[in-house]
Amino acid sequence: MITNSWLEILGVTQEQLHQDALNNSQKLFPLSVMTITQAVMGGIDPTGVFASSQESLEEALKDEEIPLIVVTNKTKTDGAAALFYPEVMEQLGEKIGDFTILPSSTHETLILPDSEGMPIQHLKEMVAEVNGSFVEDADRLTDEVYHFDTKDRVFEKVDKFVARQKENSQKHVAEKGTEGIQKPKKSHEMSL
């Protein structure tokens, strides 16, 4: 473990250590993105779905009953962090739009396009059930469900996303409600 004392002795800042860790993680543990079917079948072409043409991910997802995407690294060990490699969420968003993030384990993260319209409560229950039944305590991340908003580039808990959407919707309705209403003219103004 690297302590602040070691950083000071080595003359390395926390920011530099963080940046080096990000760069090295991507080199040593390259990103792997595949459909759930490909993952179950042993990771067929694990990087091709993401690295090649934009159509490849969409085409692969068309054949899926539930279009779940698995994000991990090539070793499939401690790969959940690969979702946080620079620009990964943004690139996924370009291909599939907004998406919900289901923390599967420390080894992978599941991504579900919002276009599927799965009820949030159902997803939360599913994550909690799978974690409780199939994921070892040491590999468990959380029972929370997260969301990535491609337009605003916001990663947040799904409950916060829903609240933010509701707030934005209410603001939009309030703004729409005042459109077209003319301000009363001053008493000294005349109209013909």
Predicted stretch roles:
Residues 170-192:
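Non-Sec secretion/translocation targeting segments of pathogen effectors
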Residues 106-176:
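Alpha-helical oligomerization segments
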